[in-house]
Amino acid sequence: MKDRDIDDILKRAAGEAPGVDPALLDRVSTSIGSGLLPVRPLPPSWILSGGLVAISGLLARAGAMLLKPYGVQKMSALEIGAVFSLLCVLVWIASVLCVAEVIPGRRRLMPPWLLSACGCAALAAVFGLLFHDYRMERFVSHGVACLTAGLALALPASIATWLLLRRGFAVNAAAAGLAKGTLAGLAGVAMLELHCPIFEAPHVLVWHIAVLPICGVAGALFARTRGRPAT
């Protein structure tokens, strides 16, 4: 092959591409345009976060009133201030994270898994400082009852959270599910602190705190499974 042949090949390759049928372009444009519908913008982030905080607080209180608020009636002022101040902070952080996870590009305070881990550690520290009764009377039977009640309260909390944030888009479905599950778990823990009169340290350290990681993992697994494309 000579240099002239190579030049001819390159010139033909660089030549103008054949035109596309205008009718085909019109059909493509029409098909795309027919599927584009206007959407309402999300409310401001602070409104969404405030709504999540309100949902968690109202459901926790409603659950405690339904089961009777024996726990908070038995607490001292110091115990009430320490436990519920911590829960309020954790619920607020979880609410902000939930909103950030459904708004692409939104800055996050921390990864959801870190919130879940830090929340468990902080609750364990506060419970360990406040409650010094280390008896384990009916540890399993009482514990399973509290765990079940906390998880049962977390279910409507997670549904309400999903409904409020349903118009958002989660780039990382598992992380968003973990954040929502953690928030729902915190609502369950708050309800238990209002309701449960058992202040034995092993009971609250194991069964009350267990609601938080269980709900977080369940939320992440559910979101990941739901977001996985069908094969």
What are the residue ranges of the model-derived segments?
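Alpha-helical transmembrane segments of multipass membrane proteins
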Residues: L59, V91, S95, A122-A124, ...
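Selected alpha-helical membrane-embedding segments in polytopic membrane proteins
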Residues: V39-M136
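Non-cytosolic membrane-interface motifs at loop->transmembrane helix junctions
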Residues: M75-A82, E137-A149, A174-A176, A201-A210
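C-terminal ends of transmembrane helices
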Residues: A94-R106, T161-F169, A223-R224
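Cytoplasmic-side transmembrane-helix entry/capping segments in multi-pass membrane proteins
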Residues: R106-C120, G143-V144, N172-T182
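Positively biased amphipathic helices and basic secretion/translocation or surface-docking motifs
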Residues: K11-L48, F222
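C-terminal halves and exits of single transmembrane alpha-helices
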Residues: S116-H142, A160-R167, M191-C196
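Terminal transmembrane helical module of multi-pass membrane proteins
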Residues: L163-T231
